């Protein structure tokens, strides 16, 4: 199935501790049906000192969210479902609320 959410999309969290927060997609994990969203679902990781990071310590990073818990934000700033439409010889993503083509 084609990807309805892609890297760089602006999304809003629909459920969980960060419900209502918006951010852009940093990474899509299609095998796990998960996405990593910038500044959302932050977790603390205890890292050992390495040559790349001699300090080590506790670092905050984004954890993956399930795709069903996020929705793409349309041009009006509201969450929308994503559909597909054929324009010429290309298949494009379309916002269900406004009918506009989603860039990406």
UniProtKB/Swiss-Prot annotation:
Quote the protein name from its UniProt record. Large ribosomal subunit protein uL24
Q: Which GO terms describe its biological process?
A: translation
One annotated Gene Ontology cellular component of this protein: ribosome
The record's note on quaternary structure and interaction partners says: Part of the 50S ribosomal subunit.
Write down the species: Caulobacter vibrioides (strain NA1000 / CB15N)
What this chain does, per the entry, is described as: One of two assembly initiator proteins, it binds directly to the 5'-end of the 23S rRNA, where it nucleates assembly of the 50S subunit. One of the proteins that surrounds the polypeptide exit tunnel on the outside of the subunit.
Ordered alphabetically, the record's keywords are: Ribonucleoprotein, Ribosomal protein, RNA-binding, rRNA-binding
Q: Which PANTHER family match?
A: MITOCHONDRIAL RIBOSOMAL PROTEIN L24 (PTHR12903)
Q: What NCBIfam families does this protein's entry cite?
A: rplX_bact
Pfam families from the entry?
A: KOW, ribosomal_L24
Q: HAMAP family under this entry?
A: Ribosomal_uL24_B
Protein family membership: Belongs to the universal ribosomal protein uL24 family.
Q: Which GO terms describe its molecular function?
A: rRNA binding; structural constituent of ribosome
Q: Which InterPro entries match?
A: KOW (IPR005824), Rib_uL2_dom2 (IPR014722), Ribosomal_uL24 (IPR003256), Ribosomal_uL24_CS (IPR005825), Ribosomal_uL24_KOW (IPR041988), Translation_prot_SH3-like_sf (IPR008991)
């Amino acid at each position: 199935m084609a990807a309805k959410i892609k890297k760089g999309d602006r999304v809003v969290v629909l459920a969980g501790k960060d419900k209502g927060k918006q951010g852009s997609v940093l990474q899509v994990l299609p095998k796990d049906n998960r996405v990593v969203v910038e500044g959302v679902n932050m977790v603390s990781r205890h890292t050992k000192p390495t040559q790349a990071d001699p300090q080590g310590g506790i670092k905050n990073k984004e954890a993956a969210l399930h795709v069903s818990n996020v929705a793409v934000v349309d041009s009006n700033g509201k969450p929308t479902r994503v559909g597909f439409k054929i324009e010429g010889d290309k298949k494009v993503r379309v916002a269900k609320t406004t009918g506009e083509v989603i860039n990406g």
